[in-house]
Amino acid sequence: MFHPRARTMLLLSLPALIIGVASSLVLIAAMKVASVFQQFLWQRLPTNIGIAYDSPFWIVGMLTLTGVVVGLIIRYSPGHAGPDPAIEPLISMPVSPSALPGLLLALIIGLAGGVSLGPEHPIMTINIALAAAFGSRLFPRITALDWTILASAGTIGALFGTPVAAALIFSQTLSGSNDIPMWDRLFAPLMAAAAGSLTTSLFFHPHFSLPIAHYTQMRLVDIASGAIVAAIAIAAGMVAVWCLPRLHELLHRLKNPVLILGIGGFILGILGVIGGPLTLFKGLDEMQQMAFSQTLGAGDYFTLAVVKLAALVIAAASGFRGGRIFPAVFIGAALGLMLHAHVEAVPAAITVSCAILGLVLVVTRDGWLSLFMAAVVVPDTNLLPLLCIVMLPAWLLLAGKPLLAANRHEP
């Protein structure tokens, strides 16, 4: 009844569905545990002790302790809590399963303790390793590369609550040929992403969109304004690109993860005191609080953006286990709100979306993901043509530039 091509796609459907659901469940479990632990550390415990959770003493002490604990996990756990996210790309080949318990624990403690990183890199590493380990036993004919693709697609769908991001990302990597069309190659990853996003939606829905005034009509001056905003965001991001490898090398001369992460946590605490609680944690909930605030002005948004960018660099350079996409979105939103407050003639929809596009592009060097993040934070169809046009000069600015990554050091 089905063409051989269709049968091949159907054979991959079951593994794709399983991987997508499992990828989402791993993410949900980690986020739920981290959320409960965060509430204990930042609400119940300081209340019981009689200390304000936003007091300098508590912020510095909690982040320093978080760094020390994560450092102990990295030093003494099997596999040293997986690869350093500052060195490895978001999607890479499977790591040893023995490293996963330490990696998961380091992620949860970092998220709960207020470290300015998201869950995407460790969750991606965990899901890829689990998929390759169990999948190769259940379906030995499927290669490790295929398991990597399915797990990463399922994780992307789960993280962003939609399979669209996975479809965009893998459409540029899984190019078709005369024998195998692109959509044949996309079928299984897209199914994994759909399963991951649907499973996530049963428990919670990632809320990215901000309450920003509707953008009515594109004008030529708006294109120029958007390009300038994106260029400013890229310039800010390139400061982080310059700082990260140098700071990473400087800190890792100490050799001891406990000392490195303890110092990193202490610096994060100092930054948290300067920027306030909004600059802590992964940034999505804090971005909503920032956008809904009626008291913040241009100077406040600037402080939030600078402190969060510095915290992102410190956290990544120290070796905390976490991703950089979610904090980059927060930084872009803060930068965009600051620019709109300075020049109110430029709509906030343009400043926020184009700043996010520029920052995420620096962090990921993925045009589709950058467009996607800008579009979901400011969900306005009138903006899509403008964002696509603004992407062109932004991509030119970053062509051939170094990535936001540290260099691998000899032990």
UniProtKB/Swiss-Prot annotation:
GO-annotated cellular components: plasma membrane
Annotated SUPFAM superfamilies: Clc chloride channel (SSF81340)
Membrane-topology descriptor: Multi-pass membrane protein
Pfam families recorded: Voltage_CLC
Compartment(s) where it occurs, according to its Swiss-Prot or TrEMBL record: Cell membrane
Main location: membrane
Keywords: Cell membrane, Ion channel, Ion transport, Membrane, Transmembrane, Transmembrane helix, Transport
One MF term in the entry's GO annotations: monoatomic ion channel activity
Tagged with keyword Transport: yes
Protein name: Putative ion-transport protein YfeO
Gene name of the encoded protein: yfeO
